[in-house]
Amino acid sequence: MDIVFALGGSVLMPKDGASAENIKSYAQVFKKLKDMGHNVSIVVGGGNTAREYIKVSREFTNESVCDEIGIMATRMNAMLLISALSKYSVNFVPTNFKDAEMILNLGKILVMGGTHPAHTTDAVSATLAEFTNADLLVIATNVDGVYTKDPRTNNDAKKLEKMTTKELIEITGSNSISAGSSSVVDSLASKIIDRAKLKTIVVKGTPDEILKSVLGGHDGTIIIP
């Protein structure tokens, strides 16, 4: 199966900082899936690293430059994961899909970050899934699925176990597109998922849930075209 993972930067690089053991635990999951015969592509977010740099840079520059800074952070995070994957990947972070395709053609795990200003890594992962005709897109984030509202700030938020791409667009339509903004799935990604008719699963970004998103038994949200 061809699988694209959107790996949230905040789960790979949590607020308490970088941890070699944490990064290794994600690498082990992706290695296992590769050993099982799956083609694995990973788009890594910028997380707290990106947001801290963007917060500072916003004091003296515009959103487009902040976007570029955020993209650089995603690529640093991608390089960390590549290092942990060792021979399973290649020592290179592609910046476009043609280079990404070459890595997949080598039979390696593809790891990349952002590509264009104003595009989140969710949008990049959805576009990559469309480009590669992936069988599954997995969005691994800091909440355990899609909710009617942000569960971190709304006690009455209800989790959705299954939904359509059209329903996803309705929920995500008002999300911010400022540099460093974060939501479970952003509005552009939702539209690409709908356009490409991608089977998508949103899960809590733990190694165990990521594995279950492929093998079964996950506790996330299934999005169907």
Curated annotation (Swiss-Prot):
Activity regulation summary: Inhibited by UTP.
SUPFAM superfamilies, per the entry: Carbamate kinase-like
EC number(s) on file: 2.7.4.22
Cellular component GO terms held in the UniProt record: cytoplasm
Binding site for UMP: 46, 67, 115-121
Reactions the enzyme catalyzes: UMP + ATP = UDP + ADP
Gene Ontology MF terms: ATP binding; UMP kinase activity
Family in the record: Belongs to the UMP kinase family.
Protein name (database record): Uridylate kinase
Organism: Methanococcus vannielii (strain ATCC 35089 / DSM 1224 / JCM 13029 / OCM 148 / SB)
Gene: pyrH
